[in-house]
């Protein structure tokens, strides 16, 4: 697809280290004008996507992919700030409740920001500082 071919996105696959099993995909856009990283796309593999599978094989895939966006933001010198657009109202509420996301735009209630303490907490749960 054209989306996968976009050079302006950093694309990552999340795998289980022991088996190489693919469990999620993420695409991230550097937004220097906003001093943050936009999480363009994150998706769990079908077997771990609660919408598709009901019972998930693995939990925390989306959170780990968000944490990776926070890592990119830190690497770019943005302090961990990320924003994203929730696909559904349920996912929006999940990000607000569980990850400390805050609405980013009055025009689009699905645009959310994860920054500051919320970003540090999410990062520390899933990734380690080097």
State what each model feature region is.
Residues 58-69:
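Glycine-rich acyl-CoA binding loop
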Residues 1-56, 71-83, 87-90, 97-130:
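Non-catalytic substrate-recognition and accessory regions of acyl/acetyltransferase enzymes
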Residues 65, 90-91:
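Conserved short alpha-helix immediately C-terminal to the canonical SAM/SAH-binding motif I
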